[in-house]
């Protein structure tokens, strides 16, 4: 099962690598893009969840489901705004510091410390991300960089919350609550801030549909399912496939930077970190 979960997690991470490309192509406000990513996915998730057994959910469990949705909404909001407020490279690097916060969260909330091999895997993979986008990292974007780093904190919290929920909650139920709560939160913020919610271009509708179907339902759905079978720190490291995919696509589509020798070394280090993390997962049993 872990082998299958690992492959599904890789697939999910690859699919969400499309997110920065969609945000850059869409002309809408980043928070409105985040709202529609959730809103368009919600009807499909609701229909899918109808097949689940009808059973009550305890108040603490519902509170955790709501918290998970809020954490992901905050992550999406901060990350999407960071993509517009700073360079894609800066936003990608800073928002993918989540494994650091996941490791700290595991130590703080679960009473355990990740193994040395798991910590080494995290360091190697993050070093690879730094090399991958290092030449494109620019200073002078304080607000955007801060948003990118804050999004990593929220994403780390989201991953820990999903890992806790998946011990006894189906993936579809978690995804439904995340989309519902996240969409409501971002929608309210857009209304209060006076941010237009309706797309004005057919291309924007197409981009929003891809973000909802491919990245939210497909990508996050795969990740949510896989996290029930894998350790949080391991999952967080594997998800660093996402910025590798995003960097390669940005280079191919927008000529955003150059995939030279150091970038290739960085991508290989990320893969090496994933291999080490997988070894740590196996050693942990």
Where are these regions (language model features)?
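Specific alpha-helical transmembrane segments that line the substrate/conduction pathway
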Residues: 32-43, 80-113, 151, 232-252
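Specific transmembrane alpha-helical segments of multi-pass solute transporters/efflux pumps
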Residues: 15, 51-89, 94-95, 129-131, ...
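Transmembrane alpha-helical segments that form core, pore/gating elements
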Residues: 16, 42-45, 102-104, 122, ...
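Hydrophobic/aromatic residues within transmembrane alpha-helices
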Residues: 26, 33, 37, 82, ...
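Helix-helix packing/entry segments at the starts of transmembrane helices
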Residues: 13, 91-97, 161-184, 216-252
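Hydrophobic transmembrane alpha-helices of multi-pass small-molecule transport proteins
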Residues: 45, 49, 72, 104-105, ...
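Hydrophobic/small/kink-forming positions within alpha-helical transmembrane segments
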Residues: 14-17, 21, 39, 46, ...
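Glycine-/small-residue-enriched transmembrane alpha-helix faces in small-molecule transporters
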Residues: 1-35, 67, 78, 137-164, ...
């Amino acid at each position: 099962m872990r082998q299958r979960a690992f492959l599904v997690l890789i697939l999910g991470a690859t699919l969400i690598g499309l997110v920065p490309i969609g945000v850059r192509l869409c002309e809408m406000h980043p928070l409105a893009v985040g709202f529609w990513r959730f809103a368009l996915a919600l009807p499909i998730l609701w229909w899918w969840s109808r097949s689940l057994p009808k059973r009550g959910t305890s108040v603490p469990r519902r509170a955790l489901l709501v918290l998970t949705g809020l954490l992901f909404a905050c992550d999406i909001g901060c990350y999407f705004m960071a993509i517009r407020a700073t360079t894609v490279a800066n936003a990608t690097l800073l928002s993918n510091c989540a494994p650091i916060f996941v490791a700290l969260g595991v130590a703080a909330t679960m009473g355990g410390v990740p193994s040395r091999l798991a910590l080494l895997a995290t360091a190697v993979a993050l070093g690879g991300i730094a090399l991958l986008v290092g030449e494109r990292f620019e200073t002078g974007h304080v607000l955007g960089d801060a948003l990118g780093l804050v999004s990593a904190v929220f994403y780390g919290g989201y991953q820990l919350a999903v890992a806790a929920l998946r011990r006894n909650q189906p993936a579809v139920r978690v995804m439904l609550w995340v989309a519902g709560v996240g969409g409501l939160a971002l929608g309210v913020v857009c209304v209060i801030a006076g941010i237009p919610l309706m797309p004005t271009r057919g291309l924007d509708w197409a981009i929003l549909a891809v973000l909802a179907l491919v990245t939210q339902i497909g990508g996050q759905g795969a990740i949510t399912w896989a996290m029930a079978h894998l350790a949080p720190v391991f999952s967080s490291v594997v998800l660093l496939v996402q910025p590798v995919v995003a960097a390669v696509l940005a280079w191919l589509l927008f000529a955003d930077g150059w995939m030279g020798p150091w970038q290739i070394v960085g991508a290989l280090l990320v893969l090496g970190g994933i291999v080490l993390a997988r070894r740590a997962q196996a050693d942990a049993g």
